[in-house]
A protein has these predicted regions:
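Charged, solvent-exposed alpha-helical segments that act as regulatory interaction surfaces
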Residues: 132, 136-140, 190
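N-terminal regulatory/sensing modules of transcriptional regulators
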Residues: 1-135
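Basic, Lys/Arg-enriched C-terminal extension of HTH/homeodomain DNA-binding domains
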Residues: 185-199
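Residues within the DNA-recognition helix of helix-turn-helix
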Residues: 126, 180-183
């Protein structure tokens, strides 16, 4: 396995550009040092607010994005609807493992959702593998991933909006909103929105 990864790194883009979003400055510094020393990557930014992170992401189009945040801090809707670039790998570090959260975000295009307490060597291996593995391509043309409408609706539901309000804001029938909700949950292998909320 290590040989395959090493061979892949040799053919991968040299000095991949990594963007780190971690509101905790110490966490951001630790991740930056890890990326530069172990992954031979270029850290292009460590924004600590969501608006700055999204702005930097759009401007720089990184090769990998690492979000070292607690997804329960009312940012799940934004994570589901982040700008997506087919050549970029998205990794989320969380405070605790959750199958439901992993399924929800991997169906949104995240490469991995991992517990930040995992051993450093294992974390390094996951990040290295993320840079080596081929991307999923255009998620808007892949049936494994949410449709744009499904992303928006899941994000709105996680924000506490009701289906009727979402339908009015989108200008589509209530029944269509309900259908998008259920197809989104099925894609992620989930039964209800509460599985994500309780993660």
């Amino acid at each position: 396995m290590e040989k395959n990864i090493a061979e892949g790194m040799a053919t991968a883009k040299s000095n991949p550009r990594v963007l780190i979003f971690a509101p905790c400055g110490y966490a951001a510094l630790g991740l930056a040092r890890l990326c530069e020393s172990e992954l031979e990557s270029q850290v292009i930014g460590t924004p600590q607010t969501l608006p700055h992170f999204l702005e930097t992401m759009i401007e720089s189009k990184p090769d990998m994005v690492i979000c070292g945040i607690d997804p329960r801090a009312n940012v799940l809707p934004q994570l589901l609807n982040m700008p997506y670039y087919p050549s970029c790998r998205y990794v989320l570090l969380t405070d605790a493992e959750s199958v439901a959260l992993s399924r929800a975000l991997q169906t949104a295009g995240f490469y991995a959702v991992i517990d930040k307490s995992m051993p450093l060597r294992k974390l390094t291996g996951v990040l290295r593998q993320a840079l080596v593995n081929p991307s999923s391509g255009n998620i808007r043309r892949n049936a494994r991933f949410y449709l744009p409408e499904e992303r928006y609706i899941l994000g709105a539901l996680l924000n506490g909006e009701r289906l009727a309000l979402i339908a009015r804001n989108m200008g589509i029938p209530y029944r269509s909103v309900s259908r998008y909700k259920h197809t989104a949950l099925r894609r992620a292998g989930l039964k209800s929105i509460n599985q994500i909320l309780s993660a």
